[in-house]
Swiss-Prot record:
Disulfide bonds: none annotated. It comes from Staphylococcus aureus (strain COL). Gene3D superfamilies: Aspartate Aminotransferase, domain 1 (3.90.1150.10), Type I PLP-dependent aspartate aminotransferase-like (Major domain) (3.40.640.10). Homodimer. This is Putative pyridoxal phosphate-dependent acyltransferase. GO terms for molecular function: pyridoxal phosphate binding; transferase activity.
Length: 395
């Protein structure tokens, strides 16, 4: 007899719970700022991707409200029918200036970007070299393209060179692309873009950088590609509009020719209603803020260094992060989840990250300090880490 849906779900959900892999979802009452409220209790929030605090910025809220008054709450259609508003054109022109490219295209989410852009260019006659720690949306985008997927050891340039050479010299593929995160979200390390570009030029690879955690954070806000001064060397610059930018959506920046192709061939652009007017205007306001000033960027980095130093002094393993992302690596999945719960009891909200998001045995809580945190908040968080760590004999 075949297995019923109930039997399948019950068996597998129980397995997740028994092995410390089941993630309880909390509901936030109010805005997702540096402090949040859950079930009536306030917590210092170290789990959001709201790097610059823009999700609650008054200027962005005013811009969104004004756009709703003039353009309504929805775009009303897909971009290719009559869902392209003047607000979308303004946003894409602003994004292109921000990223130092000829053009840009906005999508409904960062996940959509990778589903859209990869499959619009790569197909079954091509090969994709992909860093083994790339985001799930990259993995799914690669699968959707039906290209040959070749995993590359994480940030291993010797492995990349060898596999690029093998793929190109095999003569089996029309195009070969290398895809990498700009900043890796679980450990906070940065892709070796100068070396990647050198290898790509040697073997004629297309280059694709998903800078979801780099936009607004690296390169004085313009991203990891700008940080290395390689705007004219990377074919695809991908970014989210939901993390440092503080709203929702994603984008691809590149040549006008590339963007024209994506507008003609990328399925999320063709078959999904465009970004809402309020969101679109708020995003444009956020990007202009980053272009006009580095104040929020600088505050983010100062807060990140302060927290990282405090946790390291306590004896925690904070990994090899080169960015504000600050993991505290515990290891065992069940211990990691218990650690997160104990911190929550002390008023610090920092979620556990365990398999399958990270490899087994590398469970961690991932701290995400923002520009909106005060030093008092960070001191309170560090004190909670000291108390819980000693009680659990982790430090």
């Amino acid at each position: 007899m075949v297995q019923s849906l109930h039997e399948f779900l019950e068996e597998n959900i129980n397995y997740l719970k028994e092995n410390g892999l089941y993630n309880e979802i909390d509901t936030i009452e109010g805005a997702n700022g540096p402090e949040i409220k859950i079930n009536g209790k306030s917590y210092i929030n170290l789990s959001s991707n709201n790097y610059l605090g823009l999700a609650t910025n008054e200027d962005l809220k005013s811009a969104a409200k004004a756009a709703i008054d003039t353009h309504g709450v929805g775009a009303g259609a897909v971009r290719t029918i009559n869902g392209t508003l003047d607000l979308h054109d303004e946003l894409e022109e602003t994004l292109a200036k921000f990223k130092g490219t000829e053009a840009a295209i906005a999508y409904q989410s960062g996940f959509n970007c990778n589903m859209a852009a990869i499959s619009a260019v790569m197909n079954k006659n091509d090969a994709i070299l992909s860093d083994e720690l790339n985001h799930a949306s990259i993995i799914d985008g690669c699968r959707l393209s039906k290209a040959k997927i070749i995993r590359v050891n994480h940030s291993d340039m010797d492995d990349l060179r060898a596999k690029a050479k093998e793929a190109v010299e095999s003569g089996q593929y029309n195009k070969v692309m290398y895809i990498t995160d700009g900043v890796f979200s679980m450990d906070g390390d940065v892709a070796k873009l100068p070396e990647i570009v050198e290898i790509a030029e040697e073997f004629g690879l297309l280059t694709y950088v998903d800078d979801a955690h780099g936009s607004g954070v690296m390169g004085k806000g313009a991203g990891t590609v700008k940080h290395f001064g390689l705007q004219d060397k990377i074919d695809f610059q991908i970014g989210t509009l939901s993390k440092a930018i503080g709203v929702v959506g994603g984008y691809v920046a590149g040549t006008k020719e590339l963007i024209d192709w994506l507008k003609a061939q990328s399925r999320p652009f063709l078959f999904s209603t465009s970004l809402a007017p309020g969101d679109t205007k708020a995003i444009t306001e956020a990007v202009k803020k980053l272009m006009d000033s580095t104040e929020l960027h600088d505050k983010l980095w100062n807060n990140a260094q302060y927290l990282k130093n405090g946790l390291s002094k306590l004896g925690y393993d904070t990994g090899e992060s080169e960015t504000p992302i600050t993991p505290v690596i515990i290891g065992d999945e069940k211990t990691t989840q218990e650690f997160s719960k104990r911190l929550k009891d002390e008023g610090v909200y920092v979620k556990s990250i365990v398999f399958p998001t990270v490899p087994r045995g590398t469970g961690r809580v991932r701290n995400m300090p923002t520009a909106a945190h005060t030093k008092d908040m960070l001191d309170e968080a560090i004190a909670a880490y000291e108390k819980v760590g000693k009680e659990m004999k982790l430090i």
